[in-house]
Amino acid sequence: MTRTIPGKPQLLAEVSDTSANTLELRSGEVTFEVEPEDDITAAQLGAVLRSTDGTASLSEISAKTGVAPDKLTTILLPAQIAGLLADRSTPEAESPMAVLSSVEHVVNKLLEELIFDGPFWRAILDHPEQVEPNVYYGFGLENWYFLSRESEFDSAILSYPSSDAIRTMANDFYHEEHRHDDIVVRAFEGLGISRQDLVSARPLSTTSALIKLLSWWARTDPLFFIATIGILEGRLEKAESEGAYYDSFLRAAAAAGIATHFVEPLRQHAKVNAGHDHGSVSREFFAALPPLPVGTEARLVGKAHLFVEAYAEFFNGILEYYGDPDRPLVRTIGTSPVTTTAGVENGRS
């Protein structure tokens, strides 16, 4: 096995001269005697060992002692093998905010390509009045399934191992998000859908896939999961004429004439998120992080495409399934599916 001498080695032993040609290294109760070899003098050997204090690089030690770099390796390798060398070099690091900026740049580009130019959002944005009402209801339902299972991934970062600040922020975020599904569930009361119907129902496979993927990342790469939170929470836009916060879906639902009893709970949930500024959560988390190891940016950016693909399938799955008005709104297990809109004519107000 090849061994590499640390960039700024520190000798974990005291150096003393025992004779004109012998030095003694003492580490705890263990003592080593070392002698110069080849064309290295005892003075040079002593100078090298005493210069190995963690403050100088190998090139600096070489310049100071006059010992060639390859000879330094020969001298220090036995100490490295014996576990007497520590690395005091400062590792290269990446700025957390620069890392997040790179991830956001890639994700935003992919959002435009795969989501906002995808089937669901093109239908919603371009001709909302032609979209089946069940698609709007399905969007609300699948979001409820997502929210009601949010603890599967949010809870995983509560024990973030390397930062007290992140753990505190994660705990605050978790409490702010807790029971948001209670707000959204009210949207379905006018459709004849109860909480019990939802609890015993199955989300679409595309919704389940996104949930499981986020849960996996929250446990195996929490930093990447944290980078996705701002995207998942959504950045709401301000409608100046009405003085309230809306997102594209709520505007489309209004244009399509979807019943107020369905839209208002979703709007209320959007306002709660806007009030907590959850669209900026990822940036707040990353701003609290210490410098990150080199390679973090490449690792996180490398996962961005899969994330956006799964997110795009979440939306497109809604259009594909709920776009067929003959399919049940709620896919229950072992009971009759809910298929009516509880007296809402044509699904519109």
Set out the residue ranges of the language-model regions.
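Long, charge-rich, low-complexity alpha-helical segments
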Residues: 36-111
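Alpha-helical transition-metal enzyme core signature, strongest for iron centers
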Residues: 140-150, 170-191, 233-240, 266-279, ...
